[in-house]
Amino acid sequence: MGKSNSKLKPEVVEELTRKTYFTEKEVQQWYKGFIKDCPSGQLDAAGFQKIYKQFFPFGDPTKFATFVFNVFDENKDGRIEFSEFIQALSVTSRGTLDEKLRWASKLYDLDNDGYITRNEMLDIVDAIYQMVGNTVELPEEENTPEKRVDRIFAMMDKNADGKLTLQEFQEGTKADPSIVQALSLYDGLV
């Protein structure tokens, strides 16, 4: 993408409009903001973490932001270009429940082997607990990452093999209204 250009080429806007749930005008607006914050046209992990720190000032979002960064960074070059950013934003903010669940499963499947292991889920849940800090009062049965993961696996790991397939993850998540609600949090806000 162009260095500090305030406008995208029409063919790029058209392509991103086709690939996302955003209008041409919205793509242009997001690009303008992206270039303002990232004049190089790219966002690195440290910059991404800084953004998360603004939203979670009472916890430590570093670990979670790194996990999210890795999902946004589709081509795995250590930087998020605008096209990667807008496509991930589209799914997380306006995608269908199944699209959001596929995206979330990429977040949890840290080694990209198609399964979410207990340890992978523990890494993510621990990162979430660090990020929110003491700002959220958790029920006794979920007040540690380990307890939360035990509860999730008891509910979702139907064949008790210690790992979740995409199907188990999707079905289990849909059966838990609190998870569906969390995934729908940003609907209509962007």
From Swiss-Prot:
* Keywords, comma-separated and alphabetical: Calcium, Cell membrane, Cytoplasm, Golgi apparatus, Lipoprotein, Membrane, Metal-binding, Myristate, Repeat, Synapse
Q: Where is this region: Interaction with IL1RAPL1?
A: 174-190
Per the UniProt entry, what are the Gene Ontology biological process annotations, in alphabetical order? regulation of neuron projection development; regulation of signal transduction
Q: Which residues bind Ca(2+) 1?
A: D73, N75, D77, R79, E81, E84
Task: Note the topology in the membrane.
Answer: Peripheral membrane protein; Lipid-anchor
Q: Which cysteine pairs are joined by S-S bonds?
A: none
Domain called EF-hand: residue spans: 24-59, 60-95, 96-131, 144-179
Q: Where does Ca(2+) 3 bind?
A: D157, N159, D161, K163, E168
Which positions bind Ca(2+) 2?
D109, D111, D113, Y115, E120
What GO CC terms are in its UniProt record? Golgi apparatus; perinuclear region of cytoplasm; plasma membrane; postsynaptic density
Chief localization: Golgi
Q: What InterPro entries does the record tag this protein with?
A: EF-hand-dom_pair (IPR011992), EF_Hand_1_Ca_BS (IPR018247), EF_hand_dom (IPR002048), Recoverin (IPR028846)
State where the protein is found: Golgi apparatus; Postsynaptic density; Cytoplasm, Perinuclear region; Cytoplasm
Q: Name one GO molecular function term.
A: voltage-gated calcium channel activity
Lipid attachment, kind N-myristoyl glycine: G2
Quote the subunit structure annotation: Monomer. Interacts with KCND2. Interacts in a calcium-independent manner with PI4KB, but only if myristoylated. This binding competes with CALN2/CABP7 binding to PI4KB. Interacts in a calcium-dependent manner with PICK1 (via AH domain). Interacts with ARF1, ARF3, ARF5 and ARF6. Interacts with IL1RAPL1. Interacts with RIC8A; interaction is favored in the absence of Ca(2+) and myristoylation of NCS1 is not required.
Function statement: Neuronal calcium sensor, regulator of G protein-coupled receptor phosphorylation in a calcium dependent manner. Directly regulates GRK1 (RHOK), but not GRK2 to GRK5. Can substitute for calmodulin. Stimulates PI4KB kinase activity. Involved in long-term synaptic plasticity through its interaction with PICK1. May also play a role in neuron differentiation through inhibition of the activity of N-type voltage-gated calcium channel.
Q: What remark does the entry add? A: Binds 3 calcium ions via the second, third and fourth EF-hand.
Q: Give the record's family classification.
A: Belongs to the recoverin family.
Q: What is this protein called?
A: Neuronal calcium sensor 1
Q: Which organism is it from?
A: Bos taurus
Q: Which gene specifies this protein's sequence?
A: NCS1
